[in-house]
Design a protein with these regions (language model features):
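A ligand-binding cleft/hinge motif common to bilobed small-molecule-binding domains
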Residues: 81, 97-104, 152-153, 182-216
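Periplasmic-binding protein-like
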Residues: 113-121, 197, 201-239
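Hydrophobic residues within well-ordered alpha-helices
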Residues: 64, 85-87, 134, 181-182, ...
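Bilobed "Venus flytrap"/periplasmic-binding protein-like clamshell domains
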Residues: 38-41, 53-66, 97-99, 115-173, ...
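Ligand-binding clefts/hinges and TM-proximal coupling segments of bilobed small-molecule sensing domains
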Residues: 3-24, 146-168, 205, 238-244
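Extracytoplasmic small-molecule ligand-binding "clamshell" domains
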Residues: 2-93
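Extended ligand-binding regions for polar small-molecule ligands
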Residues: 2-16, 66, 125, 137-138, ...
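Acidic, polar ligand-binding/catalytic clefts
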Residues: 71-133
Length: 244
């Protein structure tokens, strides 16, 4: 199986100039509190101990805490509850968020990389799933994702065209969506392309990608709406991490 090693962020040191940009509302407790949903490997997931959050988003969260000179506290939560709690419960949301118009009404974003979306089916595609015609199928997604939104639109289109209904299986955890396809409870799952690739690698030949990645969109860190100080600090910290 493929393991994704996490980076050692201990070499990332405090940058006083960047840290000074943060408002007191973020720094006063000495912690950078991050909301995430650790079921979205390889971005964020739990280590073998079932407790430690690892993945490239979590490395980013900890590196950012180091630059700010704050302890990074990562809080696990259901994906759809993170954005509403940014600025109250969490300083930042780092959970492979793609930027959407709707989300931009609630939070500000700093993007850090681009990911597409993709489908995965059981190996050999025994149900002959065609990504251009999902009507009549069971489709698994994680609740609150852009993929859930997209499949709801597709389902409406199937209805409008007088075709068979799509059954949408929406799970709080991406891992449940993946398992649904492995066990045959769902015909296909729909997720960000790095997640599809990782699930295929982790399930030892039980899954395969259907078609190619599509709709590349930026992934971004979510920040309290209108908090320009934190947004600037996050932007500068990201730039520093990319430059180093």
């Amino acid at each position: 199986s493929v393991t994704i090693t996490s980076y050692d962020v201990s070499s990332v040191k405090k940058d006083d100039a960047i840290a000074a940009l943060l408002p007191e509302s973020v720094t006063k407790d000495g912690k950078l509190t991050i909301g995430t949903n650790p079921s979205y490997a390889p971005a964020e997931f739990l280590d073998a101990d079932g407790k430690t959050q690892i993945g490239y988003d979590m490395d980013l969260a900890r590196a950012m805490g180091n630059i700010f000179g704050l302890d990074t506290e990562i809080v696990s939560s259901n994906f759809d509850t993170i954005i509403p709690a940014i600025g109250s419960k969490y300083d930042l949301g780092i959970a492979a968020f793609t930027i959407t118009k709707e989300r931009m009404e609630s939070v500000d974003f700093v993007s850090y990389f681009t990911a597409g979306m993709g489908y995965a089916v059981a190996a050999g595609n025994p149900k002959n799933v065609d990504e251009n015609d999902l009507c009549g199928l069971n489709v698994a997604v994680e609740t609150g994702t852009v993929e859930e939104e997209a499949i709801n639109k597709t389902a409406k289109q199937c209805k409008a065209d007088g075709k068979k209904d799509i059954t949408i299986q929406s799970s709080k955890q991406q891992t449940d969506a993946t398992t649904a396809v492995v066990t045959g409870k769902a015909d296909v799952f729909f997720a960000d392309s790095p997640v599809v690739g990782y699930a295929i690698a982790q399930t030892d030949g039980q899954l395969e990608q259907l078609g190619k990645d599509f709709d590349e969109v930026p992934n971004a860190i979510a920040i309290k709406k209108g908090d320009s100080q934190t947004t600037e600090a996050v932007q500068k910290a990201m730039q520093k991490l990319m430059d180093d």
